[in-house]
Amino acid sequence: MRNIALKLMYNGTAYHGWQMQRTEASVQETLQRGLSMVCGERVRLTGVGRTDAGVHAERYVANFRTSSRIPIDRLPFAVTTPTPEDIVVREALEVADDFNAIGSCLKKEYTYRIYNSRIKNPFYVNRAYFYPKKLDEAVMDAAARAFEGTHDFRAVRSVGTETKTTVRTVHYCRVTRRGELLELKVCADGFLYNMVRAITGTVLYAAEGKLTAEDIPKILDSGDRTLAGPTVPPGGLYMTRLWYEDERLND
């Protein structure tokens, strides 16, 4: 059996997240259906993470096993026809037999985008969080940096998925501005349910003067979700970078 890794990108607006659902469309199920047609057998994808409903991915890796002999360079083009245009396979690669998209991932980066303007932009609907009041990116960046390091992140997660530990290491958490678009980029060895969206909501609270960067370590220590900011909408969230030992998967 071949072990094949796929480098994907997708617009998550029409999907109820990555993971298969009983009644809702998911990215995993949709792509599996197309791959099964191309490979001539049923395939099962393993994804690098469970993006939620409405969340996008500029970079995403999934792998599957197949006995199909389709040439690896033809696979991305072959799967285009049976797959909707909001899911794209950028590249397919033969990988080691023990490779697993989620288990082999070293760290991930998510980006949350905020459209900060008095007037809405239709091209950012479901692709960035519209926030009409002027935001100070320096205040937001200071608050974001307070999340860096190894902490218990219970205070910025939603109850949902069970996990052995809520301790994670955030390698960087920064806010930058490009015109009217603000971006919060956070890289960690793993993420809790809704963690990035809750961090973003807390950083927005700092910009609104509801808390300060100095309050954030105390909020994390408390483990109290009610002390942090709200969980912002999913449309502004993107998976944007991944790291693997197999460097072919890192671009």
List each language-model region with its residue ranges.
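Structured-RNA-binding interfaces characteristic of tRNA pseudouridine synthases
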Residues: 1-251
